[in-house]
Amino acid sequence: MTPGTNAPQRMIIRNARVFDGVNAKTQDNVDVLIEGSHVVGVSSAPVAGDASDGVIEIDARGRFLMPGLSDAHVHLMGNANSMMEFLQGPTGALYGNTIAEAKRMLLRGFTTVRDMGGDTAPVKSLIDRGVFEGPRIFPSQAMISQTSGHADFSFVYDVPEEFGGAPSRTEDIHFTRVADGVPRVLAAVREQLKMGASQIKLTLGGGAASMYDPLNTLQYTSDEVRAAVQAATDYGTYVATHVYTPAGIARALDAGVTSIEHGHLADEATIALIAEKGAWLSMQPFAEDDHHYPDPVRAAKNTEICNGTDEVYGWARQHGVKTAWGTDLLLEPQSAPRQSVMAARLGDFYSNAEALTMLTSGNAALFELAGERNTYRGAKLGVIAEGAWADLILVDGDPIADLSLIADPDTNFALIVKSGQIVKNEA
């Protein structure tokens, strides 16, 4: 609020070169007016108002103003904590580390993220209420897995719950949920929705981070996947699936899955099928050193996944697949800042303008499929336009000419605004 009034705080960013998140062509000499948490004006004519009116004025001096960045595949709790902390650390420390990482992620310019596994609904609530700073979060809550699936982090001789065993540690902290059979899958999906999930995350194949499942494994029967999709659809939202292989992707699409997470081992026919079905491909431009696996089995799986990246991006472009960008950094807190490096790496596969569009309005189009589970649906995300959320970054330099600028936000982001609040100001 403006001091002494009930009016929302007004801010004017003057003389900006605006990339609106949609159009590759920027607009010069633009004033952007913010009232409260929303953009209320984008004008090539000077906007009236100054400090005497209680207005915060920021002179962009012709610099590049863009929407806040987004990441379609984070594990915020996983970014912030190591595997040993997950398995043995105090639960309170897990959440403390997560809240601290949320602030660091916001300072990297990520104003919105879709969390694909972890108990982040309470973190989202605290951030949305202004208790802590961090990005907007679309939580999936626990990753749902079959026994011996990608999100089964129990120890090898632990007795599964199906045979009378206890939940694993990662289930106790709501990072994963192991569920076998249609009734338990339905219950698991509904459990995550009860806890505040915007969308549902199911694991349908092997992965690099998991110990018991080679990459070629098919996980969950078609009936189990359809059950998850039905339960999510009944709540007005969708299912996203961790899956790499053609067979796994085909099973997911046949069951009505909306978002294919990863897909790095797909063939061209499978990518064309994603386009035909109108589904999304949520990809990550992995390099081998993004993750560090100490054992040769998981290291080899990581290499195989990374080797598929170039072809899949090419086929996705060729077939017009709706593609989102994310990172999927997990269980290595020291690697969390690579989020910015991976965003810049998107320029290896798309033009810089296309990459920036995907990082802003493109990802937002996927997030919005959560329907009424999207608690931010009162305004547009990922754009600079009248009525949009006021999530903005002022960049020293031109990322359309040099996308590597976004890899170093500490140096190159002069101003970060989220929901009309200044997070960083070195303008």
Regions found by a protein language model. Give the residues of each.
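His/Asp/Glu-enriched, well-ordered alpha-helical/loop segment
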Residues: D234, N307-P399
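Active-site gating loops and adjacent loop-to-helix segments of metal-dependent hydrolytic enzymes
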Residues: M77-L94, K103-L106, Q141, T147-H174, ...
